[in-house]
Amino acid sequence: MLVIILGVIGLLASSNLVSSSTSTRVGGHLPLTFDPPENELGYWYTYVESCRFCWDCEDGVCTSRVWGNNSTSIVENDYVKYCEVSRWGDQCRYDVEEHIYYTMNCSDPKPWNPYKIAKEGVEKG
């Protein structure tokens, strides 16, 4: 009986460890945040590179947190936006400052920029 109880406790403990370790990888759970985990910055940067969490800005000059000092610096401007990102299972969601959320499959992500779409629409009209 004691062996069974210890076995159940072991299973519960290992499942808890697995779920906590997957929460920091793409595919696990990430509550809505302006500041995703450091190890996911490269993922989010690929699809919404204008997000403020991708940039270290000091005195109006911003350097990529993903590429570090090896990257080209930019002057802080309207391009650098506050973004929210979240993930539940394989559904990733992001918003570029407008509360118009874009949801995508985390394993098949697509870039989306509402500002670029609006600009293209104006040019065509």
UniProtKB/Swiss-Prot annotation:
Signal among keywords: yes
Sorted UniProt keywords: Glycoprotein, Signal
Signal peptide: 1-20
Record has Metal-binding as a keyword: no
Domain of life from the UniProt record: Viruses
Annotated glycan sites: N69, N70, N105
Family: Belongs to the asfivirus MGF 110 family.
Entry function: Plays a role in virus cell tropism, and may be required for efficient virus replication in macrophages.
Protein name per UniProt: Protein MGF 110-7L
